[in-house]
């Protein structure tokens, strides 16, 4: 009896302890909770938990944090997959910890600098994912002695412009006209705006950068990352290679005063002839002048039916007197007058181009969060030969046929030429240089939710773009990477994106630069950690 008592007693104690352990164990953790725990196992700044920068769906602030960076209500529906975690990084340590935990828990990473990705790739995914929000990573350091700026990826264009103007009346930076756009995505896709004919793209004035790779290693300059990677992230989409931490940019000179204008003409007022002439003039006129077209269907004022209104929106680096001499010589049909011209400081012209009310304060450029009021689809095209008057008339009628007012398809036409034609197509990853007359951005907006309504308007947008095929580039039909379009093609979720599988959109966005981008990707991010439905794949 004594022989069996000790082992039996010992066995009973072990079973009891196991039962107690099971009964006292916490319930299984969710993916977000696992991620928070993982963050706090990573090295931190001054002992402060990394998880303090993160929110998960059970936090009351989660929805606000998510929606502050959602620019398109199409991707805010109940059916849209939400992130497991949003990490609002403040330091590089937070970014490194986020990358590490995504790898450990097999979660995709989405990097959001401003949230303006046209297909929502910076804040949506078909598989479980985490958003790395760069909103707080927004320092801007200006050195007027050498006319350079270090700008972190989460800073907005409006913040950049405002800070430049606070230091100088005669400096600017060539980038977009939407002040809420984040520098991270805008610059890495190319970055174009109303100074492009004079100075080219944003990437043509980026002289250095800092990037963190999939192992958390930071490359502090272009020499450290290598000139091939520095080439790739200027126009090839930085998010396919790593987390862009900051850019070093070179400022450009502008006059103390510039001139802006906006003229509107309908078909009855000669819009077809004017647009036809614009195609001949806008890409070759004095490069100090940029004239954008906005083409929209409207209701006729006198008789029933619809017509087309064309707005000629101009930016001139100089005063009205010289501008009028140029237009009288090169574009007299526009009938631009001194009364049409508005003289402004460059920073004030940024307010005008952002469509803020006349005399709105420049402080509006610092506003970063916008009210999400509508649903939309955007696409792009490049035109490489002027469209005939007959072609323009057909396009205008097709726009009317595709516009169930008050909803409508409409377009912006942005002239190329000038500096853009002087830069080689392989100088940066942005390939669309010489040989293009102008770029088209297609718009379709609607204001009510619903899957059926969305399919209706997406079908209209696709049908109209298909109707534009005879007038735009071919083999491939080129597209602007920053104006993402899933209709061009996507890769399946996961690690298996291949060179051939991604070629359908790779050729449209990058043409002859695509293969080089893939080879650089294979060296710098060989596991394809930084991936999305339209990312650069590894060579396979």
Swiss-Prot record:
Annotated Pfam families: BBE (PF08031), FAD_binding_4 (PF01565)
GO molecular function, one term: FAD binding
Cross-link (6-(S-cysteinyl)-8alpha-(pros-histidyl)-FAD (His-Cys)): 116-178
The record's free-text note on cofactor binding: Binds 1 FAD per subunit in a bicovalent manner.
Cofactor(s) this protein cannot do without: FAD
Coiled-coil regions, chain positions: none
Keyword presence, Secreted: yes
GO biological process: response to jasmonic acid; response to wounding
PTM (free text): The FAD cofactor is bound via a bicovalent 6-S-cysteinyl, 8alpha-N1-histidyl FAD linkage.
Keywords: Cell wall, Disulfide bond, FAD, Flavoprotein, Glycoprotein, Nucleotide-binding, Oxidoreductase, Secreted, Signal
SUPFAM superfamilies tied to this protein: FAD-binding/transporter-associated domain-like (SSF56176)
Cystine pairs: 38-101
Enzyme Commission number: 1.1.1.-
Residue ranges constituting the FAD-binding PCMH-type domain according to the UniProt record: 79-254
Record bears the keyword Nucleotide-binding: yes
Gene3D superfamilies: 3.30.465.10, 3.40.462.20, Uridine Diphospho-n-acetylenolpyruvylglucosamine Reductase, domain 2
Superkingdom of origin: Eukaryota
One GO cellular component, as annotated: extracellular region
Signal peptide start and end residues: 1-24
PROSITE patterns associated with the record: FAD_PCMH
Cell location: Secreted, Cell wall
Residues bearing attached sugar chains per UniProt: 59, 325, 496
Assigned protein family: Belongs to the oxygen-dependent FAD-linked oxidoreductase family.
Protein name: Berberine bridge enzyme-like 16
